[in-house]
From Swiss-Prot:
GO terms of biological process kind: isopentenyl diphosphate biosynthetic process, methylerythritol 4-phosphate pathway; terpenoid biosynthetic process
Role this protein plays: Catalyzes the phosphorylation of the position 2 hydroxy group of 4-diphosphocytidyl-2C-methyl-D-erythritol.
Binding locations of ATP: P94, V95, A96, A97, G98, L99, G100, G101, G102, S103, A104
Family as reported in the entry's similarity comment: Belongs to the GHMP kinase family. IspE subfamily.
This protein's pathway: Isoprenoid biosynthesis; isopentenyl diphosphate biosynthesis via DXP pathway; isopentenyl diphosphate from 1-deoxy-D-xylulose 5-phosphate: step 3/6
One Pfam family, short name: GHMP_kinases_C
Leading EC class: transferase
Listed name of the protein: 4-diphosphocytidyl-2-C-methyl-D-erythritol kinase
Catalyzed reactions per annotation: 4-CDP-2-C-methyl-D-erythritol + ATP = 4-CDP-2-C-methyl-D-erythritol 2-phosphate + ADP + H(+)
Keywords: ATP-binding, Isoprene biosynthesis, Kinase, Nucleotide-binding, Transferase
Gene: ispE
């Protein structure tokens, strides 16, 4: 028995930081969107018990430091499972890029292993486990288009975003999300990330309106640390993107276009140096 699962990356169409919480996390409000770029995971039962994880395509730890491994251990303990699993993770989503790849992988592991081990957790039960693993893991379970609040775990499904083209540009370095949040100070970004304006633009379905509502309160923080992020945005706009925004805490920047063919044209015109460029589009399971 082999179960295959796809773990889709995400972008934040808006990201606003509302303040620091008593638990040390930051209160956020975000419009989150799944994209077609994905990792692939394969799961096989292991009667001898134990969990093994093999990673291809990225230099990631295969043990307890890996979120997929921790997701498997958490579900195994919560479900009282004695059997084990052999997991193969094939990475396509860039690591430490602001695209939520690790969280998506963990969410995919919860769903697949819940089926393979027959642990019987409901979607709500899996959501509770996902919250224990990380702020973005619950969205990895939901997917599509969603408004996220709290530290990112309180989700409201939104009207689905229309299919839009995306050019992802990842510079040759990673960014620490914790470091970016530590450096955040209110008022750094003159343009407010307006989630409600984005929700209205998505309902209207016009790519230019959606592009006009893009906003990320963390962008000025990362740009101060890594000015290359601002240069990537500039080059994407010069190449013809309708809008450009840093994904999450960075350093990946995405250029938004009306469709996939337009994204390919922007990628071809982009003045590339040493960045990784990926062309993809938004994804919604209901479209």
């Amino acid at each position: 028995m082999v179960i295959t699962a796809l773990a889709r990356a995400k972008i934040n169409l808006t990201l606003d930081v509302l303040g620091k919480r008593p638990d040390g996390y930051h209160e956020v409000e975000m419009v989150m969107q799944s994209i077609e770029l994905h990792d692939r995971l394969e799961f096989r039962p292991c009667a001898a018990g134990g969990i093994s994880l093999a990673v291809e395509g990225a230099d990631l730890p295969p043990g307890k430091e890996n979120l997929v491994y921790r997701a498997a251990e958490l579900l195994r303990a919560a479900g009282g499972v004695r059997a084990g699993a052999e997991i193969r993770l094939k990475k396509a989503i860039p690591v430490a890029a602001g695209l939520g790849g690790g969280s998506a992988d963990a969410a995919a592991a919860l769903v697949a292993l819940n089926e393979m081990w027959n642990t019987g957790f409901s979607p709500a039960g899996l959501m509770e486990l996902a919250e224990q693993l990380g702020s973005d893991v619950p969205f990895g379970l939901m997917g599509g288009t969603a408004l996220a609040r709290g530290r990112g775990e309180r989700l409201e499904r939104l009207f689905p975003c229309p299919p839009l083209g995306l050019v992802l540009v990842k510079p040759p370095f990673g960014v620490s999300t914790a470091e970016v949040y530590r450096a955040f100070k209110p008022g750094l970004n003159p343009k407010k990330a307006d989630a409600q304006a984005m929700v209205r633009a998505i309902k209207k379905g016009d790519a230019a309106d959606i592009a006009a509502c893009l906003g990320n309160a963390l962008e000025p923080v990362t740009v101060k640390m890594y000015p290359e992020v601002a240069e990537i945005k500039k080059k994407l706009m010069e190449a013809g993107a309708l809008g450009a925004l840093m994904a999450g805490s960075g350093p990946t920047v995405f250029g938004l276009t009306a469709d996939l063919e337009s994204a390919r044209q922007v990628a071809a015109r982009y003045r590339r140096t040493d960045e990784q460029i990926l062309v993809t589009r938004t994804f919604n399971p209901r479209l």
